[in-house]
Swiss-Prot record:
The lineage of its organism: Bacteria, Thermotogati, Deinococcota, Deinococci, Deinococcales. One of its GO terms (molecular function) is structural constituent of ribosome. This is Large ribosomal subunit protein bL9. It comes from Deinococcus radiodurans (strain ATCC 13939 / DSM 20539 / JCM 16871 / CCUG 27074 / LMG 4051 / NBRC 15346 / NCIMB 9279 / VKM B-1422 / R1). The gene is rplI. The keyword RNA-binding applies. GO terms for biological process: translation. Binds to the 23S rRNA and protein L31. It holds the Pfam family Ribosomal_L9_N.
Amino acid sequence: MQVILLEPSRLGKTGEVVSVKDGYARNWLIPQGLAVSATRTNMKTLEAQLRSIEKRQAQEKAVAEDLASRLNGVAVELSVRAGEGKIYGAVTHQDVANSLDQLGFDVDRRKIDMPKTVKEVGEYDIAYRAHPEVTIPMKLVVHAAK
């Protein structure tokens, strides 16, 4: 039996048409909402959904590229309490997101890549993953508060 996968699984990716045994499709995949039978109407619906998903992904990528052009060359500067070059605590993803928010950029803290824990005063390379295909490199400058 041919089915269209609605969720990624070991059988394939979402939207793929795969061939499975009739009992597996009728007793597990379809009742669990993991797949629908591959009829002509379901295929047309799938094609329309895939087109809308592609449009949405193209729009998201355009927004990410716009953000990348605005964030290009931006250095995030944080002033933290420190003693002898060591920070009391650590600089977190949330601290960087708050600093970017103050600069006028609305970013998701979970998409900020910091290569290591920042516990010392200095300059670090960080990145913001705005989209799976768009990564924005930035500098993080941490200095001691006076």
